[in-house]
Amino acid sequence: MKLHELHDNPGANRKKKRVARGPGSGKGKTAGRGIKGQTSRSGVALNGYEGGQMPLYRRLPKRGFSKPNRLEFAVVNLGQLQAFVDAGKLDAKADVTEDALVAAGVIRRKLDGVRVLAKGEIKAALNLSVAGASKAAVEAIEKAGGKITVSRPAKEAAAAE
């Protein structure tokens, strides 16, 4: 197979139908919109408008709420940490902080802090300093000979003061 032999399957690309371009096109005059009425005109009704009937989104009750100052954590699994140590992107001997995880590319940004979860296995003895960790993750890290320091997220600490 060569580059010049590549082409779409028959019928994969359809030409766009040009409307309102005379009677010969088959879609002239009313352009497939029918005659008169709201939908024949520009600016058709808004989605969710049911012609004056009480709309569905108002018939149903409100539920729940969004916590405005909710903390959002970047999640890191033990398997990810081990993979980055094996690849040489994370130094197991040095202290592993949230900033070090961002620099190594384990996470893109730390949000309100980093939370370590126990998915996967860890063999490296890491000295971690993060904002949160599950009990299983703490046990696994300590079992591997590492140490984990869980500090409160900066946002939470500021709110407590």
UniProtKB/Swiss-Prot annotation:
Q: Name one Pfam family in it.
A: Ribosomal_L27A
Top-rank taxon of the source lineage equals Bacteria
Q: Which GO terms describe its cellular component?
A: large ribosomal subunit
Give the PROSITE patterns listed for this entry. RIBOSOMAL_L15
* Region of interest called Disordered, as start-end residue ranges on this chain: 1-47
Record field: compositional bias (Gly residues): 23-35
Q: Name one GO biological process term.
A: translation
Q: Name one GO molecular function term.
A: rRNA binding
Protein keywords = Ribonucleoprotein, Ribosomal protein, RNA-binding, rRNA-binding
InterPro entries from the UniProt entry: Ribosomal_uL15, Ribosomal_uL15/eL18, Ribosomal_uL15/eL18_sf, Ribosomal_uL15_bac-type, Ribosomal_uL15_CS
Q: Which PANTHER family match?
A: 50S RIBOSOMAL PROTEIN L15, LARGE RIBOSOMAL SUBUNIT PROTEIN UL15M
- What this chain does, per the record? Binds to the 23S rRNA.
Family, similarity comment:
Belongs to the universal ribosomal protein uL15 family.
Subunit structure, briefly? Answer: Part of the 50S ribosomal subunit.
Name of this protein: Large ribosomal subunit protein uL15
Recorded source organism is: Paracoccus denitrificans (strain Pd 1222)
- The gene for this chain is rplO
